[in-house]
């Protein structure tokens, strides 16, 4: 029996797992002991990776839709030719930007790189992905405040922090291994700020049940009180930051009296939270989608960063303003996908970076794309406006997951060509495609992923591919070959080739990985970037900003702030309730296309969409447990749910898990001004007993 160490490709923790394989079958999966991320632990999703493509497995050959709606299977060679010819015809007829793509946060670094090079540099297409839906806010905030999208922490900080503050995060459900690190810490206070009395809130020492989307007001008020009470770290502010005086003047108007009224907390609760921050010696702030997915999300993230900076809680053990990433390689997509910045970072109009990246890739600088991609929402809007004619969807299911998802259904119907590349042919998106390209799951892949704390780890094939089965990397390569892209066919033959290109592109950047050898990642503890050529690995867990130096031109972090914006979707008499969304259970993943293959997960979860409603509101509406209800959204759509009664949501709020397509039928087409990340958490709705 062989033992193969590889990386889980669900969430951004990137647990390592030992796969025990015999006769090309996975006999058991055991979490890797002493791996610095998960140290012998895993959630149910990771230890069930052997279930991928066991109940639902497509024919391994590509297929095309014929005129009568039926499908015809092709050889891979003919499939690549079909994709290349149809993309070329559309580009020639309508122009380069008539073609676009939407990808994921779950491919490898090497696949992101190859796809980004082919689609962006060679074809000049717009390519965005799931990272826009979950982490764009954090990426933009980091870049503006720190000078680069560089989360500074290591997971060890959860075990070293004496005051752990979760804001819009529910790690017990969404990141259970991260929560395990919290439990390892014997000397901590846990604070949760969340409108919902979530699983994490229930296991916290303090819960602040803030009103939905009033985070920014609360955060500015906390800053004002900290300044008034002289609780700031003046030395750190002076030596390592800029624009604090402007911030100090700005927050004066955010008084505790106003915040109490707006946020739904008592003045005493707000003042208590200030004292908890002040009394902590090592305070860490942790946020995820509850902050990232909002109409003023970037400024909310930066308000958290401001609190860490002004109290000196950054760059030290157990501290930091720490974003919790969602998908397994969202961090890799942020720096190595060629979508919002050059490979390895840097703006597309930066002449020095353009020259270095072109040299690293061995191409003429003129081949490099010269602007960022259109964001996800603009791609959908341009399809519906008739400007984008072809869309290539890779490893994602936007018919379900896109906000206000009926707009994506409309878009699919308007396309001349929809290509879907996925491990399943029966997702809501796959079923609508013109060309389907089947890919193998992660247990048959090779490459690299980067986790939420910047750790590169190896994805290594645990099972041999069967006849006609291909990795995403091989599919991209085959299409590039059919397109006649000699630069790719000659130089990007293997994932290792792509990794070495990205390594060269990273030289001199904050994410420098020139000291990482592809082969050395296998059977290792992973390596956090930066790791430059000549560096020696002294410890498995390293943090950034320990020297107080940031990646801005003057090496100082910036205090950034902006007046709290008016909510674009206020409640009204017609739509009096707020519709909040999030993960339902530990075992479910996104649109359930993968986790539906785990029997004990599916046995435990609802087969129908459900939502939580406050018991008092339910009583007033005549709604009882398991009643069927209709929820009507201001976006014009309605959906049916099963009602679950609870005291864990406020009277005027509803909560629905994202794993059912009905949920995002109701979410709004509202986006943060800077990150263009959708505001998934704050639709306004009304609710009725079915049949009323």
Feature locations, PLM:
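Flexible glycine/proline-rich, aromatic-decorated loop/lid segments
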Residues: 196-199, 423-460
């Amino acid at each position: 029996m062989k033992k193969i160490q590889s990386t889980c490709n669900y969430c951004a923790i990137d647990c390592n797992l030992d796969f025990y394989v015999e006769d090309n079958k996975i006999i058991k999966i055991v979490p890797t002991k002493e791996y610095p991320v998960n140290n012998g632990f895993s959630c149910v999703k990771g230890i069930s990776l052997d279930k991928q493509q066991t109940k639902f497995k497509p024919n391994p050959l590509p297929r095309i839709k014929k005129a009568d709606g039926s499908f015809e299977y092709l050889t891979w060679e003919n499939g690549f030719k079909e994709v290349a010819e149809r993309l070329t015809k559309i580009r020639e007829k309508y122009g380069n930007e008539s073609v676009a793509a939407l990808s994921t946060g779950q491919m490898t670094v090497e696949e992101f790189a190859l796809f980004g090079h082919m689609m962006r540099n060679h074809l000049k297409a717009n390519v965005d992905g799931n990272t826009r839906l979950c982490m764009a806010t954090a990426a933009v905030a980091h870049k503006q405040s720190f000078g680069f999208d560089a989360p500074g922490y290591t997971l060890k900080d959860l075990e070293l922090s004496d005051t752990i503050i979760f804001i819009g995060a529910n790690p017990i459900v969404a990141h259970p291994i991260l929560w395990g690190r919290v439990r390892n810490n014997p000397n901590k206070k846990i604070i949760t700020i969340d409108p919902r009395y979530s699983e994490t809130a229930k296991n916290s020492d303090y819960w602040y049940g803030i009103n939905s989307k009033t985070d920014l007001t609360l955060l500015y008020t906390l800053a004002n009180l900290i300044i008034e009470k002289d609780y700031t770290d003046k030395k750190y502010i002076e030596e390592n930051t800029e624009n604090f005086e402007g911030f100090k003047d700005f927050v004066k108007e955010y008084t505790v009296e106003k915040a109490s009224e707006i946020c739904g907390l008592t003045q005493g609760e707000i003042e208590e939270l200030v004292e908890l921050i002040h009394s902590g010696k090592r305070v860490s702030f942790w946020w995820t989608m509850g902050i990232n997915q909002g109409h003023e999300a970037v400024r909310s993230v930066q308000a958290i960063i401001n609190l860490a900076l002004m109290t000196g809680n950054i760059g030290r053990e157990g501290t930091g303003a720490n974003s919790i990433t969602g998908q397994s390689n969202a961090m890799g997509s942020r720096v190595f996908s060629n979508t919002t910045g050059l490979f390895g970072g840097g703006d597309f109009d930066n002449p020095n970076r353009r020259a270095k990246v072109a040299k690293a890739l061995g191409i003429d600088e003129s081949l490099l794309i010269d602007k960022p991609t259109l964001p996800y929402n603009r791609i959908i809007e341009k399809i519906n406006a008739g400007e984008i004619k072809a869309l290539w969807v890779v490893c994602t299911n936007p018919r379900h997951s896109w906000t206000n998802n009926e707009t994506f259904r409309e878009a699919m119907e308007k396309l001349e060509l929809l290509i879907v590349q996925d491990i399943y042919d029966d997702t809501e998106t796959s079923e609508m495609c013109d060309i389907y390209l089947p890919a193998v799951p992660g247990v048959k892949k090779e490459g690299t992923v980067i986790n939420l704390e910047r750790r590169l780890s190896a994805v290594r094939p645990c099972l041999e591919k069967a006849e006609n089965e291909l990795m995403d990397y091989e599919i991209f390569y085959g299409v590039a070959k059919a397109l006649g892209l000699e630069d790719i066919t000659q130089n990007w033959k293997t994932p290792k080739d792509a990794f070495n290109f990205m390594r060269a592109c990273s030289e001199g950047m904050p994410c420098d990985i020139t000291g990482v050898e592809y082969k050395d990642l296998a059977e290792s503890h992973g390596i956090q970037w930066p790791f430059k050529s000549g560096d020696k690995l002294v410890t498995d867990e390293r943090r950034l900003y320990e020297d107080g130096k940031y990646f801005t031109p003057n090496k100082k972090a910036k205090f950034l702030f902006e007046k709290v914006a008016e909510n674009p979707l206020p409640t009204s008499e017609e739509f009096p309730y707020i519709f909040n969304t999030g993960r339902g259970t530990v075992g479910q993943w996104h649109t359930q296309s993968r986790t539906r293959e785990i029997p004990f997960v599916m046995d435990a979860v609802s087969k129908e969409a459900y939502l939580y409603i406050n018991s008092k509101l339910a009583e007033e509406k005549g709604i009882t447990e398991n009643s069927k209800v209709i929820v009507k959204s201001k976006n014009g759509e309605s959906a049916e749910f099963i009602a679950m009664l609870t005291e864990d949501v406020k009277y005027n709020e509803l909560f629905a898990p994202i794993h059912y397509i009905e949920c995002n039928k109701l979410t709004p087409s509202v986006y943060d001004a800077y990150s263009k990340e959708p505001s998934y958490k704050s639709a306004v709705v009304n609710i009725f007993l079915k049949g009323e």
